[in-house]
Amino acid sequence: MYGHHGYPMHAHQQQMVNPTLAIVDNKMHTLSTFLNYIRAYRDPLRISKDLKETFHLFPNLSPFYENIPNRVNLICIKGTIPICFKGINYYLPIIVWVPLNYPQEFPTMVLDPTPEMRIVKNHHHVNLQGLVYHPYISSWSSNSTMETRVSQQQQPQPPQNNISPPPYGSSPTNNNVAAQQQQPPPPYGSSPSTSNSSSYTQPPPSYDSIKNKTNNTSSLPPPKQPQTSPPPPPTQQQQQQQNNNIIPPPQQPSPPPAYTEPTAAKQQQQQTSPSVKPLPPLPPQPVIDKKSEMVDQCTIKLQELLSKFYDTTSLEIKDFEAHNKSLEELSKKKLLEKEELSNQLATYNSQIDQLNENIEQLEKWINENDKSDSNIDIDQILGPKDSLSKQLLKLVSDDSTIEDLLYYLDKALHSNRISLEEYLKNVRSLSRDQFIIRATVKKVQFIIRQNQQQLQQQQQQQNSPQRQQYNQQQYFSK
């Protein structure tokens, strides 16, 4: 396991401090807030439970967030995990991405090397991009846990350095250093020892075969941040207690670690560094409060119910708003129709009043002219009423009379009843009278025609408002 900046650390100095309950609760509070904010995960309770156990088992892991646009919001935990190889412990910086369908889909683990580290080529479990593959993925199920997935990376792996890493804080002899320098590292892809090969005969699947199974978020980790120094390592007793809690992985050949040290100067510096005294043992870890876990679960459940209630209520409110808008439009239409009906009602009432007046006038005239047949004077009834009509009737009758006289005088002349002198004398006199009568008839007709035109104009002026009202009624009815 690599320590700060990838330097190897000795086992007795790898004392990882167990986090207190307050630190774990703080991390879980941050994750719960994030889960309630995005509301995208299928099983947030299972995620909270597994992450809490992971934080207890690996205190160096912490939630990591980064505001990156146009990317799915996924939970990410970042930190270092310890591995032990040949009595030397190393800290490996990793990033773990939790998919949306967890635990149906396995989490994605990516190595996060510092600038001083490099990834070994053709590694069995790590590609050049840092994506980690482990045989535990091939057997992943919904019952698998995240802390077991991370624990698989703690298995001993032989380092692939040009010089074997010395124990941190110790000053080995020159013979040991020379022996270490002369001992070549195991080549990549070399077969493991006989004891290991008997327990794991089938090699793990390649990275290309498992790459298709991972989701899109596994190949797009967020930008890296500077690696922070790990917390103090735990004591040997605490390390042994943690190892007892870890689920043992299946036996397999140990591939080389993903990182190698670029220079040997840092290794010499570690060899010459003085030994560091182990830290005193820490007090026992406090008991986890189950009541707080239940409160957190209840809070998450209530927030889910509130979210569902908010969604359904918002949809109902939108439906009610649309219904209210339609009702307002209908009310406006009803008001317009009511105004039109009131105007039509006023017009019809005025017409009814006018018809009643006409009916009264007709009844009055009928009562006045209701007489018996014996008292009726036909000449008075059928004769003209005004003086001009009477004069015109008399003139027309005189003109017809003169026409008859001229006709009979003409017949008397042909039958030799009268002489020619008498005929001419009578014709001259009657013609003069007929001319005067006809001229008077034309004057009387002209005066009567003028009176009729004036009467028609007066009637038209009286009927024009009624016609306008009638036209308006016809227009609105259309």
Swiss-Prot record:
PROSITE patterns according to UniProt: SB, UEV
Biased composition regions of type Low complexity, renumbered to the chain: 190-201, 236-246
Compartments where located: Cytoplasm; Membrane; Nucleus; Late endosome membrane
UniProt-listed GO biological process terms: defense response to Gram-positive bacterium; endosome to lysosome transport; plasma membrane repair; protein modification process; protein transport; response to wounding; sorocarp development
One GO term describing the cellular component: nucleus
Biased composition annotated in UniProt, kind: Polar residues: 170-179
Composition skew (Pro residues), residue ranges: 156-169, 220-235, 247-259, 277-286
Domain UEV intervals: 24-172
Keywords: Coiled coil, Cytoplasm, Endosome, Growth regulation, Membrane, Nucleus, Protein transport, Transport
UniProt topology in membrane: Peripheral membrane protein
Main location: cytoplasm
Region annotation Disordered: where it falls in the sequence: 144-290, 458-478
Pfam family, one: UEV
Domain called SB: residue spans: 386-454
Coiled coil stretches, renumbered: 321-372
Molecular function terms, GO-annotated: ubiquitin binding
Free-text comment about domains: The UEV domain is required for the interaction of the complex with ubiquitin.
Family, similarity comment: Belongs to the ubiquitin-conjugating enzyme family. UEV subfamily.
Function: Component of the ESCRT-I complex, a regulator of vesicular trafficking process. Required for the sorting of endocytic ubiquitinated cargos into multivesicular bodies. May be involved in cell growth and differentiation. Acts as a negative growth regulator.
Complex and partners: Component of the ESCRT-I complex (endosomal sorting complex required for transport I).
PANTHER family named in the record: TUMOR SUPPRESSOR PROTEIN 101, TUMOR SUSCEPTIBILITY GENE 101 PROTEIN-RELATED
Protein name: ESCRT-I complex subunit tsg101
Gene: tsg101
